[in-house]
Amino acid sequence: MDARRKHWKENKFAPLFSAQDIPNEAAQLESSSEQMPLDKVKRMEIIFNLSSRKFREENKFKRKEFISQPNENEQESNLIERKINISKTEADTNSVSCESSNLDIATEESFNSTEELPTWVIKELSTPPQKDKKKKFTEGMSSKLRLNLLNEELEVLDMKCKKIEEEFESAEKELLNSKKEVSTKPLNFQEAEVETSKTDWELQALRNDLSEKATNVKNLTEELQQAKEVIHKLSLENKDLKETVRKLKRQTEVGNAFLKEEMKLYYELEMEKIRGELTAIKNELRTEKSLQARNNRALELLRKHFASVMPSGTSDNFMGDFF
């Protein structure tokens, strides 16, 4: 792993100049195909940043993909191969970017991903190379200043390389942690399965209880509905009975009034009849009395007549025989 990192670092950040190349730098600056101007260094730095960013994004994606898939060994080998391919691609991009024609191709590829780049990166990529200004700038510098400039650039690149190595180590640690998490997942799955079975059993018991209660509620609802229907029917019957009683009471009152009136009329008729009969009896009695009084007078007259015609002894005998 360390040898591969060292090889990748040497290919990625190969020194542009050495101490022996400084005396001959003036002659080398004349051939643009063998030099790396300052703007090309900036472009290389941009390409490096793009590659690093792409590496981090793919690393995060691979971690997620690794966790989601069950085969750990296959995922680990695929992830390492992809990282090696990314490192090789970055090294190839760095070596190819030293040449002007391939640098333009890499720049065009970086332009295709400008949607994900900040504004200042797009401006840097869109700025055309200024070879004449670089030549004038380097021609006016001494060899010592150029060496210091190159050393500073090399230090910056070393710092970036260390940062990338730290990120790579962090990614490996996260990968190991992911492997540990994945190794503990089967046990967690078994516990979760037991817990799920227990939960399913409890849920089934609750469902059965709920079904039984729902059946009871349904039966009680039906009984309540039947009771309501019976109560409604009894209410109607009670209402009918009350109406019948009211009618009977009314009829009784009317019958009593009619009977009372009829009895009164009958009493009056009977009284009238009795009065008539009493009057008739009184008339008969009066007639009888008058007849008796007449008879008494007639008898008195006869007695007197016989008394005057006959002697007293004979008349008394005659009257005794007569009575």
Curated annotation (Swiss-Prot):
Belongs to the CCDC160 family. This is Coiled-coil domain-containing protein 160. Keywords: Coiled coil. Residues 143-290 form a coiled coil. The lineage of its organism: Eukaryota, Metazoa, Chordata, Craniata, Vertebrata.
